[in-house]
Swiss-Prot record:
Reactions it catalyzes: N(6)-[(R)-dihydrolipoyl]-L-lysyl-[lipoyl-carrier protein] + a hydroperoxide = N(6)-[(R)-lipoyl]-L-lysyl-[lipoyl-carrier protein] + an alcohol + H2O
Species assigned in the record: Anaeromyxobacter sp. (strain K)
Keyword list, A-Z: Antioxidant, Disulfide bond, Oxidoreductase, Peroxidase, Redox-active center
Any one GO biological process: response to oxidative stress
Gene behind this protein: ahpD
Protein name as catalogued: Alkyl hydroperoxide reductase AhpD
């Protein structure tokens, strides 16, 4: 994980916990390499930090097939749309909106390049990052029905949380070095 090692080293001191967690969550566990790296790619894309995404993509491409990376990126793209749409319907809470057809194309959900269950796991992780309760519940039901355990779901969401925190922490790097007003006046 040479590229993510550089990301970890770039994290400022206030993000020390994130630095340690970033190393830990991508170690082998209950997820397959395709699941682990797919979740990492999808959630790094959802976090919208180019530097983090480039690092995760470089490491993922060394570990998994191109179809996994394509599916992870597709999950991030489709969920960027779906999470907004379904979160709106959920938040408004009106039956009239729930009855309206979405009329949004989401063919990749039905026919991913690699594993259907893995794609759903990537979508679940992105939905957790994006805060769409409806999508989280839906994708969690699909992956559990597809044979994944709650431990695997939990591991995926841990990866999502840490990747999101890493993206935020990279943004902090410039601010951590700026002296406070009190120190500057000192």
């Amino acid at each position: 994980m040479a590229t993510l090692d550089a990301i970890r080293e770039a994290l400022p001191e206030p993000a020390r916990d994130i630095k340690l967690n970033l190393q830990a969550v991508l170690q082998p566990g209950t997820l397959t390499p395709a699941q682990r790296w797919g979740v990492a790619v999808a959630t790094a894309a959802a976090a919208r930090n180019e530097r983090l995404l480039a690092a995760v993509l470089a490491d993922a491409r060394a570990e998994v097939e191109p179809a996994v990376v394509e599916d992870a990126l597709a999950a991030a793209a489709v969920m960027a749309m779906n999470n907004v749409y379904y979160r709106f319907r959920h938040m408004v809470g009106k039956a009239s909106y729930a009855e309206k057809p979405a009329r949004l194309r989401m063919n990749r959900l039905v026919k991913p390049a690699a594993s259907k269950v893995d794609f759903e796991l990537f979508a679940l992780a992105v939905s957790a990052v994006n805060g769409c309760e409806t999508c989280v519940r839906s994708h969690e039901q699909v992956v559990v029905a597809g044979g994944l355990s709650e431990d695997q779901v939990h591991e995926a969401v841990r990866i999502a949380a840490v990747l999101h925190a890493a993206a935020v922490s990279l943004e902090l790097a410039g601010y951590a070095a700026v002296p406070s007003a009190a120190a500057a006046a000192g």
